[in-house]
Amino acid sequence: MKIVIIGASFAGISAAIASRKKYPQAEISLIDKQATVGYLSGGLSAYFNHTINELHEARYITEEELRRQKIQLLLNREVVAMDVENQLIAWSRKEEQQWYSYDKLILATGASQFSTQIRGSQTEKLLKYKFLSGALAAVPLLEKSQTVAVIGAGPIGMEAIDFLVKMKKTVHVFESLENL
């Protein structure tokens, strides 16, 4: 059996591990547009609070751990088409595109950040650190900034507010709900 999972965040990885337990002989593939898996979105907080030395340590699982479980990782790939009738998906990476067959398909594409829907949010000054690549880009900008606006006061936003205040930054909080 060939199991393909689109999305390699919490749900996708959980589905891959559960599938491996239930179907030990299956060929299992995780497809994701990110370059890495297992990054904890609270990694910046852990880094700036000196709980970890490098952002790469903010992981709940590594690529190697998944490979040891015989789970194939197809990273830096974006699914661009599906042919459900013939059980095929197409993924692309740079100039390359390939069709990939499956017996079972699991969609685990996860949540998206609301900030991407804000007009002007594509500026380099708006930091999004749900993924490791964004967190790595955020570190030098946060270190040199004196004033920071945090959009969203959910758990990750509150962690950001905490470490930014400890860094002696002026912090402005924008939250759509009435209470924090």
Q: What kind of feature is each model-predicted range?
A:
Residues 10-14, 35, 111-113, 133, ...:
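Residue-level detector of alpha-helix initiation sites
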Residues 1-4, 59-151, 172:
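FAD-binding core/adjacent interface of flavoenzyme oxidoreductases
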Residues 1-72, 163-180:
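Beta1-alpha1 glycine-rich phosphate/pyrophosphate-binding loop at the start
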Residues 14-18, 134-137, 159:
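Residues within well-formed alpha-helices
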Residues 155-161:
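Mid-domain beta-loop-alpha active-site segment that forms a flexible
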